[in-house]
């Protein structure tokens, strides 16, 4: 007869894959049309001039240019704009 006890069980051992969210192109950097600027959940940042928004709230450039981050309005919302080169 073996003298080893049975191994216990655990309810841990799972983790979700990271979603790689965040700012991909920073202020002052050049970007091409269609390039992703910010990946986010919800509208932490809003699209400004020459910036579009995808169905998953991704902000992307509509024209070539330089990225600029602006805070404006009574609610101090963060807007992302692309200044044409």
From Swiss-Prot:
SUPFAM superfamilies: Ribosomal L27 protein-like. Coiled coil: none annotated. Keywords: Ribonucleoprotein, Ribosomal protein. GO terms for molecular function: structural constituent of ribosome. GO terms for cellular component: cytosolic large ribosomal subunit. InterPro entries: Ribosomal_bL27 (IPR001684), Ribosomal_bL27_CS (IPR018261). GO terms for biological process: translation. Residues 1-21 are annotated as: Disordered. Pfam families: Ribosomal_L27. Gene3D superfamilies: 2.40.50.100. Disulfide bonds: none annotated. It comes from the Bacteria. HAMAP family: Ribosomal_bL27. Belongs to the bacterial ribosomal protein bL27 family. This is Large ribosomal subunit protein bL27. It comes from Janthinobacterium sp. (strain Marseille) (Minibacterium massiliensis). The lineage of its organism: Bacteria, Pseudomonadati, Pseudomonadota, Betaproteobacteria, Burkholderiales.
